[in-house]
Design a protein with these regions (language model features):
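Bacterial Sec-dependent N-terminal signal peptides
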Residues: 1-23
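Beta-lactamase-like hydrolase cores
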Residues: 19-51, 56-62, 89, 136-142
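Hydrophobic (often cysteine-bearing) scaffold residues that line and stabilize catalytic clefts
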Residues: 21, 25, 66, 70, ...
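Conserved serine DD-peptidase/penicillin-binding transpeptidase domain
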Residues: 27, 32, 81-343
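Acidic/polar N-terminal loop/beta-strand segments that form early-domain functional surfaces
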Residues: 46-50, 60-61, 67-69, 95, ...
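Short active-site loop at a secondary-structure junction
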Residues: 57-77, 81
Length: 343
């Protein structure tokens, strides 16, 4: 009789606490759904205890996109098929000859799609680390004048940089960045935008980090209340020369809005061009890329130059760490393309 009483007592308390948890979950769920940020969101979840007993659900039978949870499978595949020590490579080479410090050919940068090239996340692999090694490699050969072009060979992957089903209002933002054969700074730029003093006032650009070269900007954002948060959207597309941002930003403070660079290979090329000039290395030709030549209706065949630098990415285990920790879409898309070519 004593055992039966104890069993019933346990059931009573389990039922009591389950009801209490269920009530709290319901209140929290409804509160969450009333937030402005949840205006167009979908939510579905089901809660059970360790024994599988039902506690609470909100549209528990509704199917939703699995979204970033799929990254777990991509990460597992990368470690299994490519290995934790796998590294991407970026190479710098040249064509022609060097005579008395003058290079008669082209300077070429090529890669097998390294998504970490120029990333800010890894110690020893930041933009300046790559740039310094490029300059050191060129100066070690005594080159101070380049007679040809600076070519960014991004032909390793195809010219379609994003999947066909991505929404238009995603691809201009940082999480919608495409994948090129040569990526740079995670194909992301950051705009520091100052909200006005009052609701409805215009906003102003204060600083753009990794400013996309040759891109014309249209800013139609306006100021909203102090606690409204970032409700802006950037509209641009791969290879576009126009970017448009609208929506609202909070008043009285600076907001950092991150977007996707429309043409990372050309962005890297133009940065490198300025880097060469700032280091007293003259270049007579122009900056171009494999994809840019295709856009211009010209043919491009990868040039076999003389290598002067092989630059390695962090190992795959470190790439996967940031892929999972920050859910970097660029990494996932690059890994899938890499599987298609190497596995």
């Amino acid at each position: 009789m004593k055992n039966i009483f104890c069993f019933l007592l346990v059931l009573f308390f389990q039922s009591f606490f389950s009801q209490d948890i269920s009530k709290k979950l319901d209140q929290t769920t409804k509160s969450l759904l009333n937030e402005p940020e949840m205006y167009s969101a979908n939510l579905s979840f089901y809660v059970a205890d360790e024994q599988g007993n039902f506690i609470y659900e909100y549209q528990g039978n509704k199917g939703l996109s699995t979204a970033s949870t799929q990254k777990v499978f991509t990460a597992m595949a990368a470690l299994e098929m490519l290995g934790k020590d796998f590294r991407y490579t970026t190479k710098v080479s040249y064509t022609g000859n060097i005579e008395e410090g003058r290079l008669s050919g082209d300077l070429i940068v090529s890669s097998n799609g390294d998504p970490t090239l120029g990333s800010w996340r890894y110690t020893g692999y930041k933009p300046e680390d790559f740039q310094n090694k490029v300059i050191q490699a060129i100066k070690s050969l005594g080159i101070y004048k380049i007679g040809g072009n600076l070519i960014i060979d991004d032909s390793y992957f195809d010219i379609q940089t994003i999947p066909g089903g991505w929404p238009w209002n995603d691809i201009g933002n940082y999480y919608g960045a495409g994948v090129w054969g040569v990526n740079w700074r995670e194909n992301q730029f950051d705009m520091h935008i100052s909200g006005g003093a009052n609701a409805g006032a215009s906003t102003s650009f204060k600083k753009i980090v990794n400013l996309p070269e040759q891109v014309k900007w249209v800013n139609e954002t306006h100021t909203a209340g102090k606690e409204t948060g970032d409700r802006s959207i950037i509209y641009t597309a791969p290879y576009s020369e126009v970017a448009y941002i609208n929506g609202t930003l909070p008043s009285g403070k600076m907001t950092v809005v991150s977007g996707s660079v429309p043409n990372p290979p050309m962005q890297l090329g133009l940065e490198m061009y300025n880097l060469l000039l700032n280091n007293d290395i003259e270049i007579k030709g122009k900056v171009t890329s494999a994809s840019q030549l295709l856009i211009e209706g010209k043919e491009y065949a990868p040039l076999k130059g003389k290598e002067i630098l092989v630059y390695y990415s962090p190992t795959m285990d470190k790439i996967v760490y940031w892929f999972m920790r920050k859910s970097v879409n660029l990494y996932g898309e690059t890994l899938v393309k890499t599987f298609g070519l190497l596995v």
